């Protein structure tokens, strides 16, 4: 029953030895030999969505050149000379009792005064638009502040600018939610959640309406000139209405400042007509294909109008976006649904 014992087996210790890692000589770094670098914050990065807007703004921004300064200096010198000549002519006409010349000089002075007054009004409106950017910076600081007292005064100022009195339901809900223990950040967050959406909803409604009208107009328009004129008119009207909603009265220069992105929209409308005509000759003369191509071009124009409206909201809105920034995809779904419904009714 007992099994015999197996003989002993002796193994040689011939396992390979792992080579020890070789240590490299130490390196000492100092400030002189090192390469200087500076960290890049995420705020400095330009998002892909706003790359086109940044490029157009940089292209349209006037360059501070020597020729520009010389022209401005010449215009200023000419204005001073004309004013001095007018005063001298007025004095001579009064002494010589030349009533006809005196009347002409007086009429010219009134016209010049009206022009200067218009320039002052335009400057004030442009300054109001720039002041809105400063208010956004103040609001951004208050959203990171733990102080007390500044937030409520700032929000009441924004409500007055937007034309919301103390009897408005949104203002009443906001005031009822306030507590004396709330700091500036909490007061501003309550305003952004209870009052600001009232204006944002109206602005979104205006954007949706203008985008839908642009889509349907481009879809049925046979002429590129009509497309361009209609889009320009609709976008001007959209900018004016959005600015008025947020309490900003636009002048000539401030309207141009907000209307820069319309250049993309107009250029797209003119080019889309050419692409559509070439595509029609290349594809077919079928009616269904023609309608689908026109609808696609209309959706593209409507999306660009919606993007212009979103940009106008960003420039006119007194508060920075928290988590409620409108997306282009929301308007895209609405436009596609409206175009599909229109095509089905047409059949």
Curated annotation (Swiss-Prot):
Membrane topology of the entry: Multi-pass membrane protein
Swiss-Prot/TrEMBL keywords: Cell inner membrane, Cell membrane, Membrane, Transmembrane, Transmembrane helix
InterPro entries from the UniProt entry: DUF697, UPF0283
Location in the cell: Cell inner membrane
Transmembrane segments: 70-90, 100-120, 213-233
One of the Pfam families matching this protein, by short name: DUF697
GO cellular component: plasma membrane
Biased composition (Basic and acidic residues): 1-11
Annotated region (Disordered), positions in chain: 1-20, 30-49
Family, as annotated: Belongs to the UPF0283 family.
PANTHER family: UPF0283 MEMBRANE PROTEIN YCJF (PTHR39342:SF1)
NCBIfam families: hyp_HI0043
Protein name: UPF0283 membrane protein PC1_2326
Organism for this UniProt entry: Pectobacterium carotovorum subsp. carotovorum (strain PC1)
